[in-house]
Amino acid sequence: MNMQRTEQIHEKANGLDKLEGAEILAILLDSQVEAAKCVLPAIEPIERGARAMADAIINGNKLIYAAAGSSGLQAMADGLEITPTFGIPISQIKILRAGGLEDMSRPKGEMEDSEEAAINDAKIIEAGDCVICLAASGNTNYPVTIMEICKKLGATTIGIANNPDTKLLENSDIPILLPTPPEVIAGSTRLGAGTAQKIALNMMSSCMGVYLGNVMDGMMVNLIANNTKLFKRSEEIVMNITDCNRHQAAQSLKKSKGSVKLKVPRFIRLKGTPNFPITAP
C-alpha cells in the first residue's frame, strides 16, 4: 500500500537540518505557496459548497464544522468568525472538534480515533443541516463517523481532504480535494495542508456571506458591532454607502443596536437618491 501524500517526505527536505536559517525558511515558504495553488482546481466544488452552506442558513438549519487535530483548528478559525462577520445567529453555527473546544492547551490526539465521541457530538445534527467534515488524511475516524451519521439523517455533507481516494471524499455530497505536496516536516499537516484548508474554508464561508446578501461592495453590511473597532468600521460602512456624515451614521447605528444592514437599505439616503430623506425607524 502506497504511503499517503500527507505522510511522504518533501523532495526538498533532505538535509534540511544542515541548512542556514534563511534557506530553511525559503523552503518552508515555497511549500506554502505550492499548497495555496492546490486550491485553484477545486473552485467548482468550493462554489457548490458555498451554495449548500447558504441554503442551510436560509432555511433556518445549521452550518456545522466537524474535524480533529490541525484540521479542527482550521475549522474553528473559520467557524468562529461567521457570526461576527456576517451576523448569522450563533445558534446556526456549530463546531464539532474531537476532544471538544474547552481546555485546548492540552492536545487530545487520542480523540481523533474515538467513534464514541463522534456519535455523541453528532447528536446535534438534523436533516437539512450542512456539515463540513475535514481531515488532511481524509480517513480520520472522528469526521468520517460524523459524515456517516449525516448521510443517515439527511444532512448535506461537504468533505475536504488533502489525499485522493479517501473516505471523506468518497462519501460526501460535495467532495473537495486539496492535493497539497508532502510537508517539509513530514506529516505536520498544520503546514501546507492546513494552509490549503484555511483558504478553502475562507473562500466558502465568504462566498456564502455574499450569497446571503451580507456583503455589499466588499463590505460586511450585516456586521453587528460590539466593540470600538467594529463600531468605527460600521460607521465607515454606513458613510461609504450613503451620503450621511459620521454623526448621522453613529446615531443611526445606536438606534439599530449596531446593525449596519438594518439601517443602510431602509432608513438612510442612498447615494444617487437625493429625494430619499434620512429617517429613523
Describe each PLM feature range:
Residues 63-199, 205-214:
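Glycine-rich phosphate-binding loops that contact phosphosugars or nucleotide phosphates
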